[in-house]
């Protein structure tokens, strides 16, 4: 399985970041980890002393995504988090909403994430896995992974990644505290309980979804149990043709857990100091408001 790509980052920087809290980064459909590393260059620069960003490759080969070949045409192979039918253009396929109607290969997604986690551990990184970050299709998968974790925690199930990492000899476990979602479409994908969870247990069969244990009152759990309540930062380009679908993902989240950053851009990652700084400011606000002492930017 493909894993993370750190070739685009100076080795010295990654050595300095070994102790920092880690964020797992999921690229958009029709790109790959190497491309996403480059697309996040401005964000990485502002977070160099705060977080270690680790970029995972998706499991499925695909055609290039929108506007990818004009800049990164020689950076293939291109990948997708969901299987795209052979010979089908990924841009037209996604625009038609086909990704919502297919069976998601949860095992393949989980294997890629486990490979990225294990490889970064082998590189000597020791920081906690504290967050997810994704763009477009990767943002949708990141939010869906966070929601799966929320269901597992509410039911007292073993998290997928901890069980899988143990099998692979890795030392990490994941307890994601937030996600940063750039241009992510709703609704959430059904990722089940993951290949390493206790999906067949009586607890799993007795409850479909709920909020993180201990984070809300019983009344709030009953009212918002179907919503993602782990904190999310949603970054929307106001000139993105898919903006309304991105706002649909916001509606899948509990309002009090959501922060929104809007910028004057299309369907791409922000790169200016001002626009990226607004995202970093929200991360800082999240760390302070949630009293995440180790996550202060």
Curated annotation (Swiss-Prot):
Induction: Expression is regulated by the asperfuranone cluster transcription factor afoA. InterPro entries: AB_hydrolase_fold, FSH-like_dom, LovG. The active site is at 136 (charge relay system), 240 (charge relay system), 267 (charge relay system). One of its GO terms (cellular component) is cytoplasm. One of its GO terms (biological process) is secondary metabolite biosynthetic process. Gene3D superfamilies: alpha/beta hydrolase. GO terms for molecular function: hydrolase activity. Its EC number is 3.1.2.-. It comes from the Eukaryota. Residues 204-217 have a biased composition (Low complexity). Transmembrane segments: none annotated. Asperfuranone provides anti-proliferative activity in human non-small cell lung cancer cells. SUPFAM superfamilies: alpha/beta-Hydrolases (SSF53474). Residues 204-226 are annotated as: Disordered. The keyword Hydrolase applies. Keywords: Hydrolase. Probable esterase; part of the gene cluster that mediates the biosynthesis of asperfuranone, a probable antitumor agent. The polyketide synthase afoG is responsible for producing the 3,5-dimethyloctadienone moiety from acetyl-CoA, three malonyl-CoA, and two S-adenosyl methionines (SAM). The 3,5-dimethyloctadienone moiety is then loaded onto the SAT domain of afoE and extended with four malonyl-CoA and one SAM, which leads to the formation of 2,4-dihydroxy-6-(5,7-dimethyl-2-oxo-trans-3-trans-5-nonadienyl)-3-methylbenzaldehyde (compound 2) after reductive release and aldol condensation. Belongs to the LovG family. This is Probable esterase afoC. It comes from Emericella nidulans (strain FGSC A4 / ATCC 38163 / CBS 112.46 / NRRL 194 / M139). The lineage of its organism: Eukaryota, Fungi, Dikarya, Ascomycota, Pezizomycotina.
């Amino acid at each position: 399985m493909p894993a993370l790509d750190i070739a685009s980052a100076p080795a010295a920087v990654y050595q300095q970041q070994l102790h920092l809290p880690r964020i797992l980064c999921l690229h958009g459909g029709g790109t790959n980890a190497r491309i996403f590393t480059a697309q996040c260059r401005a964000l990485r620069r502002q977070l160099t002393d705060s977080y270690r960003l680790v970029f995972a490759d998706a499991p499925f080969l695909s055609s290039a995504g929108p506007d990818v070949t004009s800049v990164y045409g020689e950076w293939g192979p291109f990948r997708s988090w969901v299987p795209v039918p052979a010979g089908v253009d990924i841009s037209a396929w996604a625009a038609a909403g086909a990704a919502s109607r297919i069976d998601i290969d949860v095992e393949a997604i989980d294997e890629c994430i486990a490979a990225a986690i294990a490889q970064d551990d082998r590189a000597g990184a020791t920081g906690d896995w504290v967050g997810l970050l994704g763009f477009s299709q990767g943002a949708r998968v990141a939010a869906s992974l966070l929601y799966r974790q929320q269901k597992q925690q509410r039911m007292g199930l073993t998290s997928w990644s901890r069980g899988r990492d143990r099998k692979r000899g890795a030392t990490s476990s994941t307890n994601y505290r937030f996600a940063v979602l750039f241009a992510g479409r709703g609704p959430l994908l059904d990722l089940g309980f993951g290949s390493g969870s206790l999906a067949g247990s009586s607890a799993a069969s007795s409850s479909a979804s709920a909020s993180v244990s201990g984070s809300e009152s019983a009344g709030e759990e009953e009212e918002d149990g179907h919503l993602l309540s782990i904190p999310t930062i949603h970054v929307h380009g106001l000139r993105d043709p898919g903006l309304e679908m991105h706002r649909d993902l916001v509606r899948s989240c509990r309002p009090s857990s959501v922060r929104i950053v809007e910028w004057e851009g299309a369907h791409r990652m922000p790169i200016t100091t001002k626009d990226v700084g607004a995202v970093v400011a929200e991360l800082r606000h999240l760390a302070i408001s949630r009293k995440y002492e180790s996550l202060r930017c």
